[in-house]
A protein has these predicted regions:
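Structural beta-strand/beta-sheet cores of well-ordered domains, especially the beta-sheet scaffolds
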Residues: 13-15, 31-32, 41, 60-67, ...
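A short core secondary-structure module
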Residues: 1-46
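Short, low-complexity, polar/charged sequence segments that are solvent-exposed and flexible
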Residues: 16-19, 36-38, 52-56, 83-88, ...
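Flexible, small-/acidic-enriched active-site or ligand-binding loops
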Residues: 39-70
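Alpha-helical interface subdomain recognition
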Residues: 63-68, 74, 79-82, 88-258
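Residue-level preference for beta-strand/loop junctions
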Residues: 11-13, 58, 131, 169
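Short alpha-helix boundary/capping segments
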Residues: 6-11, 26, 52-58, 91-101
Length: 258
């Protein structure tokens, strides 16, 4: 397994490990989550994975090798085959939290963009007045507020409808927010010039975090598939209901002699 976050931290003593235990079961019942002490024989931390060239030591995202690792059966959480179920309980709220923090990053990037635009001059003007920088600021603010409303709606759906029914809204914000925040940070770096990718600015670190988030807790493509599949299903069911209603009307007319 690789990109195991936090496994390099010396305080990490036990891992919650997702493994396939029931390959012949229904797809969502094949996985189990098992507690594995990090010092169990056969567990090898190969080393840190790099993210955009950084290893984030000592906490990091580790590459871990399992060779004939054995633990007691009672280490299975909730019972065999419930790993996916456990993950979904955590992932829904976790994705909302990711998006909330992402909006905070977008707000910070916008502040830095405005500060740079007002404090830096070129060609005798403040750079905020050059090119389309004012429009860039406007569009960033509009997108931030749109993202905020979407995240609030997803959180409301989670509170009122529960994890399962809110999953489409959660997928929508997870597919949308990190990508849009990446764009806002990218625009802020552009306003800063080369300083925006230097050690003098937090923007490059903010960008890599947001770009990485487009893989974490499900890549964009998975969430787009979930959204589109639900939308297609709704369309098909709606058309089926309409077709049935037409048939009932037609049948009623025939029986009534109309």
């Amino acid at each position: 397994k690789y990109y195991i976050s936090g496994a390099g931290d010396p305080r990490c003593k036990i891992m919650i490990t997702m493994v396939k235990t029931s390959p012949d079961a229904d797809p969502f019942r094949q996985q189990s989550q098992i507690l594995v002490p990090i010092d169990t024989p056969g567990v090898e931390i190969v080393g840190p994975m790099h993210v955009f060239g950084h290893d984030d030591a000592p906490h990091g995202h580790m590459h871990i090798k399992f060779t004939n690792v054995r633990v007691p059966e009672e280490n299975i959480l909730w019972g065999e085959g419930r790993g996916f179920e456990i993950s979904q309980v955590r992932l829904g709220p976790g994705r909302i939290h990711h998006c909330m923090r992402s909006i905070g990053s977008a707000e910070k990037a916008l502040d830095l963009m405005i500060e740079r635009g007002l404090s830096r001059e070129a060609f005798g003007k403040k750079i905020i007045d050059l090119g389309k920088n004012m429009e860039t600021i406007s569009r960033a603010k509009i997108e931030i507020e749109a993202m905020r409303l979407m995240v609030l709606k997803a959180a409301k759906a989670m509170d009122v409808l529960g994890n399962k029914e809110a999953r489409i809204w959660v997928s929508m914000i997870k597919a949308m927010v990190p990508e849009k925040v990446c764009n806002i940070i990218d625009q802020a770096m552009q306003v800063h010039g080369a300083t925006g990718i230097s050690q003098w600015s937090p923007l490059s670190g903010m960008y890599t975090s947001q770009r990485t988030l487009r893989f974490a807790d499900g890549p964009d493509e998975v969430h787009h598939h979930v959204i589109a599949r639900a939308e297609v299903k709704d369309y098909q069911e709606s058309n089926l209901r309409t077709s049935r209603a037409r048939d009932e009307i037609a049948t009623g007319r025939t029986r009534g002699g109309v």
